[in-house]
């Protein structure tokens, strides 16, 4: 009795499985698959983008180096302007110093001439009859006028033996007008006349 029931159960299971297989075959039969399409599905490869050999690669080190190079070029391009401005300033200072030096040298170049702090020029001469004491000749606007005043006084005192600033002009010019107010020109002339009383020298017609 038990064996009959077991066999009937097995038959029922087999029939059920067969029905499922038939249904599945019929369902798949409804689809018409192209053989080439199905084979192509197995041949599809995953698309991986290839990197071009010339494409740039973002390297942090190369980016930093490029930035430093650009900064160095910009600083080097601006440095000539700074150097040119500093060199111009140094040149101006050198020119000013050279001009001041030339003015001082020119003022000292003439015998018996001293430059005043305010820019004018004083002329004076030493009197050999008074142990080399100085005789003030006046203050003049230019060093040349002061030098001519000295030459006139020296020519009166020492004659042609005098050492002059302008020896070729001896006796040609009168002494320039004194621009100072400390002493009158007549007083200076009288003092020179007194100092040359013991000497015989020709008078200065033009200085």
Swiss-Prot record:
Record region (Disordered): 70-101, 171-207
Xref: SUPFAM superfamilies: DNA-binding domain (SSF54171)
Protein location: Nucleus
Pfam families attached to this UniProt entry: AP2 (PF00847)
Entry keyword set: Activator, DNA-binding, Ethylene signaling pathway, Nucleus, Transcription, Transcription regulation
Chief subcellular location: nucleus
Gene Ontology biological process: ethylene-activated signaling pathway; response to stress
InterPro entries: AP2/ERF_dom (IPR001471), AP2/ERF_dom_sf (IPR036955), DNA-bd_dom_sf (IPR016177), ERF_plant (IPR044808)
Record feature DNA-binding region, as residue ranges: 109-167
GO cellular component: nucleus
Low complexity composition bias: residue spans: 74-87, 197-207
Stated role: Probably acts as a transcriptional activator. Binds to the GCC-box pathogenesis-related promoter element. May be involved in the regulation of gene expression by stress factors and by components of stress signal transduction pathways.
PANTHER family: DNA-BINDING DOMAIN, ETHYLENE-RESPONSIVE TRANSCRIPTION FACTOR ERF105
Annotated family: Belongs to the AP2/ERF transcription factor family. ERF subfamily.
Name the record gives this protein: Ethylene-responsive transcription factor ERF106
Organism: Arabidopsis thaliana
Lineage, highest ranks first: Eukaryota, Viridiplantae, Streptophyta, Embryophyta, Tracheophyta
Chain's gene name: ERF106
């Amino acid at each position: 009795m038990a064996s009959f029931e077991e066999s009937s159960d097995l038959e029922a299971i087999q029939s059920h499985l067969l029905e499922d297989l038939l249904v599945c075959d019929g369902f798949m039969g409804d689809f018409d698959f192209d053989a080439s399409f199905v084979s192509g599905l197995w041949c599809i490869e995953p698309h991986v983008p290839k990197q071009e050999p010339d494409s740039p690669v973002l390297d942090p080190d190369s980016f930093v180096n490029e930035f430093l190079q650009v900064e160095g070029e910009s600083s080097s391009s601006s440095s000539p302007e700074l150097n040119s401005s500093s060199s111009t300033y140094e040149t101006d200072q050198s020119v000013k110093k050279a001009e001041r030096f030339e003015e001082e040298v020119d003022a000292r170049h003439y015998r018996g001439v001293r430059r005043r702090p305010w820019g004018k020029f004083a002329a004076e001469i030493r009197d050999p009859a008074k142990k080399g004491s100085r005789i003030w000749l006046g203050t003049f606007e230019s060093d040349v006028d002061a030098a001519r005043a000295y030459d006139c006084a020296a020519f009166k005192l020492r004659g042609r033996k005098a050492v002059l600033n302008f020896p070729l002009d001896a006796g040609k010019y009168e002494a320039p007008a004194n621009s100072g107010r400390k002493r009158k020109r007549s007083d200076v002339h009288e003092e020179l006349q007194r100092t040359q009383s013991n000497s015989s020298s020709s008078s200065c017609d033009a200085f």
